[in-house]
Amino acid sequence: MAKIKIELVKSPIGYKYDQRDTLKALGLRKVHDVVIQPDIPQIRGMINKVRHLVLVKALEEEE
């Protein structure tokens, strides 16, 4: 399964609580935190909701 790297690049201060909760659900707490998540539609939907706060990169599959 493909993986994606998500980095929080902008502080969620001043944004709505649902966006802050989405970041917490992704595992992002502080600016420049990085998490690796599976590339599935549910995660992509959460990324779309906070796309103005995060940077997303696809990771190469290792076999």
Curated annotation (Swiss-Prot):
SUPFAM superfamilies: Ribosomal protein L30p/L7e. The keyword Nucleotide-binding does not apply. The keyword Cytoplasm does not apply. It comes from the Bacteria. InterPro entries: Ribo_uL30_ferredoxin-like_sf, Ribosomal_uL30_bac-type, Ribosomal_uL30_ferredoxin-like. One of its GO terms (cellular component) is cytosolic large ribosomal subunit. Keywords: Ribonucleoprotein, Ribosomal protein. One of its GO terms (biological process) is translation. Belongs to the universal ribosomal protein uL30 family. Part of the 50S ribosomal subunit. This is Large ribosomal subunit protein uL30. It comes from Pseudothermotoga lettingae (strain ATCC BAA-301 / DSM 14385 / NBRC 107922 / TMO).
